[in-house]
């Protein structure tokens, strides 16, 4: 489950709580279960959008549990395979939060499809083995080409070099930069300098409550640094 109100599993399968994984990393964002508190709901949304972004921007095949795109929490039960009731069922009744989430997932999938550099079949080398001017995959912090942010900062940038693959048009893919900030404070990340006349464009910012994916790509005001708001993800294209 990716919904942000997990809690410990319950003994409801007659297996004395020995079924499933012993690892249950969870957070309720300050309130257990359903809530009308806007702050808690917004924090859960942020966590959910961060998790989904990591899934779709990773190189491997994205895997979703049924209902992840519909705010399905299984009422905090992470082991509901034996629950033929409301706990294990997916509620497809539409609501505002669900519609916004489904739109976000659709756009994540569409972006991934449009940019083959994210889903390369070959393993990443993390070096410039084809002499393209930068590694196929690189990590960045408050300094470009350096992944050494202190752990307490909770932020880092990832760049996929589009020159290593061609898109459906037979042309090199764009540069793809993802800035992750898991911290409760604002973080600034460095943007690598692009070759030639290429510029960085902001495509997505999950800190935006209405539309995480911008209606139109926006030229980054600062071509050297990007501000990532608390517990959010930004996506940029270099082209």
Give the ranges of each region predicted by the language model.
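Single conserved hydrophobic/aromatic residue that forms the stacking wall/gate
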Residues: 1-10
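Short glycine-rich loop/turn motifs that provide flexible caps or phosphate-binding loops at active sites
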Residues: 3, 19, 29, 65-66
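Carbohydrate-interacting/catalytic domains
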Residues: 9, 35, 41-45, 49, ...
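Short, compositionally biased low-complexity segments
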Residues: 15-28, 74-86
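Metal- or metallocofactor-binding catalytic centers and their adjacent structured scaffolds
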Residues: 18-41, 98
């Amino acid at each position: 489950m990716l919904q942000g109100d997990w809690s410990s599993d319950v003994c409801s399968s007659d297996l004395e709580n020995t079924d499933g994984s012993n690892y249950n990393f969870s957070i309720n964002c300050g309130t257990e279960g359903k809530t009308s508190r806007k702050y808690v709901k917004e924090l859960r949304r942020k966590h959910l959008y961060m998790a989904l972004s990591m899934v779709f921007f990773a190189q491997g095949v994205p895997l979703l549990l049924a209902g992840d795109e519909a705010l399905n929490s299984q009422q905090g039960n992470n082991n509901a395979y034996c629950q033929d009731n409301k706990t294990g069922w997916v509620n497809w009744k539409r609501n505002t939060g669900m519609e916004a989430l489904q739109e976000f997932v659709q756009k994540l999938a569409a972006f991934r499809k449009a940019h083959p550099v994210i889903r390369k079949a070959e393993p990443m080398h993390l070096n410039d083995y084809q002499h393209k001017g930068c590694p196929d995959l690189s990590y960045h912090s408050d300094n470009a080409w350096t992944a050494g942010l202190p752990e307490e900062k909770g932020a880092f940038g990832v760049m996929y070099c589009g020159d290593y693959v061609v898109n459906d048009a037979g042309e090199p893919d764009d540069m793809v930069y993802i800035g992750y900030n898991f911290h409760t404070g604002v973080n600034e990340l460095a943007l690598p300098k692009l070759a030639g006349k290429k510029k960085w464009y902001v495509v997505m910012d999950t800190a935006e409550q209405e539309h995480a994916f911008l209606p139109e790509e926006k030229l980054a005001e600062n071509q050297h640094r990007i501000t990532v708001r608390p517990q959010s993800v930004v996506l940029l294209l270099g082209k």
